């Protein structure tokens, strides 16, 4: 007997997918636009509706593009610290930051640069790195799976809003259950999330699953 092609381990893509191309292409096309109409998007729905799978597919699309830097963050860790660490250690960027004399040694994120005072504030460090990325005509996509309304998430999303206001090339794609997204956007400093598009994934249609089974077996 063949294995179930739709079985899904946590965070892992299944062998077979039910296409939701319209929603995925909408996000991809908007983020890639020269003047994107939005830079934050949330994918929501009940458990098992395919949120993580869609996030993974979009993630793979952008990773294949040279002018995109894709960073995956966990909502259970210090998001700003993780974001800074991922940027500073990104293979194609570490030398760029070194040449730009961005000294991150005080924060434990890079080597000492002789003759350059180290940056002592994490947010300042991230801003400096993003400014350099912008000059290189690259964009940064941050993905967060299963967003929750905790302190580190509130701090990071609040700062992300500032980066967007500063016209820095940052994009945020999050998944989350209805109740978690609702709680997050109702924070006093995060009401801008109300204006961010939300793609609601409904439970998979039985007919779609049946047709997919027919095409496989």
Regions flagged by a language model, labelled:
Residues 1-41, 89:
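A short, basic N-terminal segment
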Residues 36-57:
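Walker A/P-loop nucleotide-binding motif
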Residues 48, 76-79, 149, 177-182, ...:
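Conserved nucleotide-binding/hydrolysis micro-motifs of P-loop NTPases
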Residues 67, 78-109, 114:
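Conserved NTP-binding/hydrolysis module of P-loop NTPases
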Residues 115-180, 186-189:
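Conserved Walker B catalytic segment
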Residues 201-217:
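Conserved small helical "lid"/interfacial subdomain of P-loop NTPases
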């Amino acid at each position: 007997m063949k294995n179930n092609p739709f079985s899904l381990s946590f965070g892992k893509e299944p062998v077979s997918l039910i296409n939701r191309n319209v929603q995925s292409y909408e996000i991809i096309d908007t983020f890639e636009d020269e003047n994107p109409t939005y830079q934050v998007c949330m994918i929501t729905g009940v458990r098992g509706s395919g949120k993580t799978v869609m996030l993974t597919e979009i993630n793979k699309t952008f990773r294949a593009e040279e002018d995109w830097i894709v960073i995956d963050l966990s909502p259970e860790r210090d998001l700003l610290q993780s974001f800074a660490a991922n940027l500073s250690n990104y293979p194609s960027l570490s030398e760029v930051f070194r040449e730009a004399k961005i000294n991150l040694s005080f924060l434990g994120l890079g080597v000492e640069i002789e003759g350059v005072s180290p940056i002592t504030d994490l947010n300042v460090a991230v801003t400096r790195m993003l400014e350099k990325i912008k000059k290189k005509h690259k964009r940064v996509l941050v993905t967060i799976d299963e967003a929750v309304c905790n302190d580190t998430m509130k701090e990071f999303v609040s700062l992300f809003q500032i980066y967007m206001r500063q016209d820095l090339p940052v994009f945020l794609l999050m998944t989350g259950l209805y109740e978690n997204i609702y709680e997050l956007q109702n924070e006093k400093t995060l009401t801008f999330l109300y204006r961010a598009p939300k793609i609601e994934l409904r439970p998979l249609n039985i007919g779609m699953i049946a047709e997919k089974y027919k095409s496989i077996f």
